[in-house]
Amino acid sequence: WESTTVGASHLYYYRFDDRTNRVGERIPLPDGELNGGVLCKPVSYSELPAELIDAFVSIEDKRFWQHHGVDWYRTAAAVVNYCTGNRISGSKFGASTITQQLVKNLSGKNDYSVHRKIQEICWANDLENRCTKEEILERYLNVINLAQGCYGVGAAAEYYFGKPVSALTVAECATLAAITNNPSQYDPYTQPENNKERRDLALDLMCEQGYISE
């Protein structure tokens, strides 16, 4: 199957037809192909402030720089939660790594079957074999749903703060990182208190993990 997404400077189809091409031959599409109220402003990795990367890694995948696509500690905890009836979606942290989240975004597969989860793990491993961590982060931060029709941090920075992503403050970076777990629940406009609570959690985790000081 194919999935439409955003690259560093173009819109692309990422092809998932076969295992050898699992993470994607990229086929350029005409500019403006995405429409219908969807906002996107692709940015390159070099434009992303370190604080933005740190905010997303801190709250979404703290072992991102160490694992190879799957965080087995979180996966094991998720299996225990699932078997005991405590569904992951009700917790502050899911089992999926940033790499796995990117796979979901590119494949369009987001059901919770065991087969789908195993498939996702295999694809995440493929992605890590094909791309650097920086390339994975760039793709991830360009395709994530950040509420209000914004896809990617470039569009969200302009929409919420009226500035390019490179000019975001630490608090603004944390605000965007707070959204992606559940865009409707953490929308800064419609759910400001929820977003603030999770933004503060992101800032606390950034401090705890040594990215910022109090």
Which residues does each PLM region occupy?
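Juxtamembrane regions of bacterial inner-membrane/periplasmic proteins
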Residues: W1-E214
